[in-house]
Amino acid sequence: MKIGLVKTNFPGERRVPLLPKDIKDFKNEILVEEGFGKFLDIDDQEYIDKGCHILSRAEVFSESEAIFSLKLIQPTDYPYLREGQMIIGWTHPFGSGRLFMKEQALPKKLIVVDLDSNSPCIYYENEIFESGIPKGLLYKNSFYAGYAGVLDALLQYGFIPTEETKIAILGSGNVAQGAFSSISKYSSNIRMYYRKTMSIFKENYTKYDIIINGIEIGKEDDPILSFSEQKSLKKGTFIIDVAADAGNTIEGTHFTSMDDPIYENDGKYYYVVPNTPSLIYRNVSQDLSKILSENIFSEDCSRFLSIKS
């Protein structure tokens, strides 16, 4: 299968998901957009030496059966998408990619292979299929999201916590673990809450100075912090949503960006940057490339078409 890799044009994104050193005996033909590896100082010739074809962005879209885009494809690329084309990457169909699914994936009958860190699935014509991709494959990326996101949030906010700072972390998964690993360098006054102890958080949430969210709730679930509950938070409370579950886990929040990462509302501060692993893109690119090479690019991606049979 012809797989096209395009440079992500998602704001602030710098990760390079395929490095030349990891291209070995691929069963797919790889088409790469010119300048693909520029953030890591990788020349196009290094991809050519590994058997890849270097093309313009428009040519990659037009000649590829499948497009790999690390982050959600942006509206400027919508005209390039062809009916029945395969899209591989982090699409977040029920989150930030909801509009993409409605306006592009469904009308154009796109086959969307979503690389969700916990349960990678294939989305096609309002149906969801098992992808065969191992679950939890990209857990390190989620860990880095929590780790780097918390560091960035604190620096952008201009505050390093002390033992007097009361900190709550929602969740116990990879994102929450990364957040804990990061913020515990500065304070041990931390309480982690998960599903069984969330009722205790509800009894104490107004006491915290920093609330870190590492949970992405389901589309039918109630928010963990509603509008009314947020009003009860003390002035200056800092909410760091490293799960980037905008508007869901923390009701009414909206995405922020690396250029403008924090906003204030009613005396509370919110950080909801959706691609925090890119803050440490040099580390993350190494892990991503190895894992994606072994589990996505090396095997013929036409296997994902079996859902249509």
UniProtKB/Swiss-Prot annotation:
The lineage of its organism: Bacteria, Bacillati, Bacillota, Bacilli, Lactobacillales. InterPro entries: AlaDH/PNT_N, AlaDH/PNT_NAD(H)-bd, CEOS, NAD(P)-bd_dom_sf. Belongs to the AlaDH/PNT family. CEOS subfamily. CDD domains: ceo_syn. SUPFAM superfamilies: Formate/glycerate dehydrogenase catalytic domain-like, NAD(P)-binding Rossmann-fold domains. Keywords: NADP, Oxidoreductase. It is an enzyme of class 1 (oxidoreductase). It comes from Lactococcus lactis subsp. lactis (strain IL1403). SMART domains: AlaDh_PNT_C (SM01002), AlaDh_PNT_N (SM01003). One of its GO terms (molecular function) is alanine dehydrogenase activity. One of its GO terms (biological process) is alanine catabolic process. Its EC number is 1.5.1.24. NADP(+) binds at residues 171-176. The keyword NADP applies. It catalyses: N(5)-[1(S)-1-carboxyethyl]-L-ornithine + NADP(+) + H2O = L-ornithine + pyruvate + NADPH + H(+). Catalyzes the NADPH-dependent reductive condensation between pyruvic acid and the side chain amino group of L-ornithine to form N(5)-(L-1-carboxyethyl)-L-ornithine. To a lesser extent, can also use L-lysine as substrate (yielding N(6)-(L-1-carboxyethyl)-L-lysine). It comes from the Bacteria. This is N(5)-(carboxyethyl)ornithine synthase. Pfam families: AlaDh_PNT_C (PF01262), AlaDh_PNT_N (PF05222). Pyruvate binds at residues 15, 71, 92. GO terms for cellular component: plasma membrane.
